[in-house]
């Protein structure tokens, strides 16, 4: 008998909503959080739009001792984790400390904290670099801070597979739950909207340079020209439903199937492996392609990448056979936070029986053969969902959720 791993709590911090229900209401209404960068003056950079999380003040939500030591990305992870636990009705003190685990994903670490410290180093010298730089930048900082804050002393991990990380973190948490953990606090956030971070992102050539926020990120569109970066993400509580604790509320859904693959180097001239990742995830879930009710796409917004994803989906489902959506068009690409947020969105979609829209995309490439949910939500009974993610460098991941 397969284990039942249920998602019992969700916490979201996103550009179009700083709580789960704010985000969900904005997403169903098609309200975008993408706009001009305000965190610094972007005038000298070719990309000047981002999905910033506005109205989020860490010092109002976390102790000053923590905010002083940690980066903005960790602040969002801590708050999302707090909200996921509260949503699940979990009091960590009531559970054995070695049976709780934390897994987070990050693709950039604490770049904003590092920006401040490098500015001090460049302008004033090494005596003006704080000691906390040594821990605030590190990819595992969020995992460490969340586990300390909640007294979770079981096996923990940090995943760095770019946007695929949000799904890979769930896969790693599943392994830990299968190995005896009772509860996992899992997800991903990222925040790299500072000069240092933006320069690093520009290096991959994928960022849109359009100034029109409504047209800058339009995946699967005839005028697709890249993606807009963003910040934020989501955290979840995942529990073994037979683990001895009665869930404090409804179960959003179950982790039914997961798989990850890695693309061969371009010079090998072998095809990418996203199709295989999806196939393996479906097999892991014990589901046929025609049993998937909706796909949450990676939707990179680069024409060649969009076509590769469409070809993978069509190879499995056939053209126009399953609704496909990309709500991240309202937040920007959140890197490790993006796939985690897609998982949250998929779970909320199954809860409410509605598929949120892809916004901005108005002239879809017909030859891609996708049944895109455009413009407005689509009501539909949803029992299953597939979330797809790709990370720069060849990472692919697929996650199947069931109700």
Which residues are covered by each model-predicted region?
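ACP-dependent fatty acid/polyketide chain-elongation machinery
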Residues: 1-66, 88, 242-255, 344-359, ...
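Flexible, low-complexity linker/loop segments at domain and module junctions
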Residues: 1-7, 92-97, 287-291, 368-403
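Condensing-enzyme catalytic core mediating Claisen C-C bond formation in acyl metabolism
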Residues: 4-8, 31-36, 212-285, 293-294
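Conserved beta-ketoacyl condensing-enzyme motif
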Residues: 7, 22-24, 28-161, 189-198, ...
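A glycine- and small-aliphatic-rich helix-loop capping segment at beta-alpha/alpha-beta transitions
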Residues: 21-26, 111-126, 176-178, 198-211, ...
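Active-site-proximal alpha-helical scaffold in enzymes
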Residues: 77-90, 139-142, 147-150, 156-189, ...
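Glycine-/small-residue-rich "gating" segment that lines the acyl/pantetheine channel
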Residues: 123-130, 171-175, 191-246, 322, ...
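Acyl-CoA/ACP chain-elongation machinery
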Residues: 181-225, 258-271, 297-307, 321-371
């Amino acid at each position: 008998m397969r284990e039942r791993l249920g998602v019992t709590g969700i916490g979201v911090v996103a550009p179009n909503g700083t709580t789960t229900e704010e985000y969900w209401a904005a997403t169903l209404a098609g309200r975008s959080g993408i706009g001009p960068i305000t965190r610094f003056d972007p005038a000298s950079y070719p990309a000047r739009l981002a999905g910033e999380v506005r109205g989020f003040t860490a010092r109002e939500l976390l102790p000053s001792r923590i905010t002083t030591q940690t980066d903005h990305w960790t602040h969002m992870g801590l708050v999302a984790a707090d909200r996921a636990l509260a949503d699940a009705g979990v009091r960590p003190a009531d559970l054995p400390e070695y049976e709780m685990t934390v897994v987070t994903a990050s693709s950039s670490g604490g770049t904003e904290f590092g920006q401040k410290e490098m500015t001090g180093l460049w302008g004033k010298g090494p005596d003006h670099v704080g000691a906390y730089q040594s821990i605030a930048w590190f990819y595992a900082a969020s995992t460490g801070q969340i586990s300390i804050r909640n007294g979770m002393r079981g096996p923990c991990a940090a995943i760095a597979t770019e946007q695929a990380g949000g799904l890979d973190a769930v896969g790693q948490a599943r392994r830990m739950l299968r190995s005896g953990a009772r509860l996992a606090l899992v997800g991903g956030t990222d925040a790299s909207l500072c000069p240092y971070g933006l320069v690093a992102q520009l290096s991959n050539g994928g960022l849109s340079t359009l100034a029109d926020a409504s047209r800058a990120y339009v995946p699967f569109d005839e005028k697709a020209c890249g993606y807009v970066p963003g910040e934020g993400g989501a955290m979840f509580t995942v529990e073994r439903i037979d683990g001895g604790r009665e869930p404090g509320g409804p179960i959003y859904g179950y982790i039914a199937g997961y798989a990850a693959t890695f693309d061969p180097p371009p010079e090998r001239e072998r095809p990418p492996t996203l199709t295989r990742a999806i196939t393996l995830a479906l097999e892991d879930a014990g589901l046929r392609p025609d049993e998937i009710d909706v796909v949450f796409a990676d939707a990179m917004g680069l024409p060649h990448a969009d076509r590769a994803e469409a070809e993978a989906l069509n190879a499995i489902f056939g053209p126009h056979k399953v609704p496909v959506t990309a709500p991240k068009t309202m937040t920007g690409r959140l890197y490790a936070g993006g796939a985690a947020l897609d998982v949250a969105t998929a779970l909320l979609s199954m809860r409410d029986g509605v598929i949120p829209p892809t916004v901005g995309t108005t002239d879809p490439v017909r030859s891609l053969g996708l049944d895109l949910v455009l413009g407005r939500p689509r009501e539909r009974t949803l029992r299953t969902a597939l979330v797809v993610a790709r990370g720069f460098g060849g990472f692919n991941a697929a996650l199947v959720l069931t109700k």
